[in-house]
């Protein structure tokens, strides 16, 4: 009977060792998978934060763009209205000018032969074109500066 007991004991010990090895193997796998899960969860959280930040920045940039686009459109409309008013005679464009002197010998005394100083039509158009471009450039510059100050930090 000693021999049978020894064989059974050896088999039980082998089974216990094999089961211990299997349990240890699966425990190591569980620890590895848990570490991978935790790492992926951290990366997912970070990615979600980045996405939220990007979406917030996109909304801010869209609002900033809408604001300056509206200001630019308003400035252009004001410039066009001013141009139309000057062309229709409802408003006057005042620019410092000097009239050329007329020889006194060729004119009668006390008679005003010269018209008031006025810009040529092309110069008037050029003035409004330059004014419009200046306003456009100024609004674009203000928008770009605000974008840089708010978004590029």
From Swiss-Prot:
Per the record, ranges on the Periplasmic side are 25-153
Q: Where in the cell is it found?
A: Host cell inner membrane
What's a BP term from Gene Ontology annotated to this protein? viral release via disruption of host outer membrane
Coiled-coil boundaries: 65-92
Which keywords are on file for this protein? Coiled coil, Cytolysis, Disulfide bond, Host cell inner membrane, Host cell lysis by virus, Host cell membrane, Host membrane, Membrane, Signal-anchor, Transmembrane, Transmembrane helix, Viral release from host cell
Provide the Gene Ontology terms for cellular component: host cell plasma membrane; membrane
Its job: Component of the spanin complex that disrupts the host outer membrane and participates in cell lysis during virus exit. The spanin complex conducts the final step in host lysis by disrupting the outer membrane after holin and endolysin have permeabilized the inner membrane and degraded the host peptidoglycans. Host outer membrane disruption is due to local fusion between the inner and outer membrane performed by the spanin complex.
**Alphabetized HAMAP family for the sequence:** I_SPANIN_LAMBDA
Q: State the name under which the record lists this protein.
A: Spanin, inner membrane subunit
**Which gene produces this protein?**
Rz
